[in-house]
């Protein structure tokens, strides 16, 4: 993940992101984790990476994105798929069970909905879920924004800190604008 500042810098930053060995290895690890999660509930021959390492641009940041799909095994339910895929490896890390234990040990505050899912199961056996990130939560007139970065062997702490700031920026800005509008 990198910040965005101008169209001209986007071209350079796209190349930088795709050429960065740390970003590439982290992303490939997450793609492999997604393939593994889906292979537990899908027909094995159907699990495939349909797009690999595309760049997606958002208002304040750009990400490397990939898409992994599979045909759900007829003996599996939407709930089976959900429990296999979530919490998402992009928010936990790998190996997932140990990564979740480490998060519980090290993070000073409970994540709450952050990193969880928002979505639905329907009566036809479908589900549609989104990961609850890039969000602001308001309780008792106090807003909180959470963000994080993936830590791997090649991580540079200052870069990971900047990544969390870049990720949180749009949500913080939205809260600030809402507060200004409320005062009008």
Task: Please name every model-derived segment.
Residues 6-184:
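Extended alpha-helical targeting/anchoring segments
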Residues 1-2:
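Short, well-ordered junction/capping motifs at the entry into regular secondary structure
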